[in-house]
Amino acid sequence: DVDIIFDPMETGNGIEYLPEQVISDVSWTDYHPIKQVYMTCNCDTGQMMWDPLTVINAVEGDDLFMLSERGIVGLNDDGSVSFTLSATGNSRFQMPGDDAWRSAMLEIIRNVNKILINNN
């Protein structure tokens, strides 16, 4: 059985990948779509990291994360999501971590971009 892991906004919004970090980390190429947005569109919003966190969880496993109890996720008629605790459920949510955890997660994300420098 494989759990479905969700990263709610509360978790991903706590990790911001700043534009200057992105530009530096992808310095190995001039043609990176996110880098181009930051360099040409006067965009300084940074990126929140909820999507990469689920990938890290899939690759690295659960040990780096605090996860909710098991449950069942449902989609409501109004488009909102519900979560019902269930010992037999196949869904779990990542829980927000502290500042040290957020820094560690950002470093993992940044290292993926930096690794590509050595492979080009």
Regions found by a protein language model. Name each.
Residues 1-120:
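N-terminal acidic, glycine/proline-rich low-complexity segments
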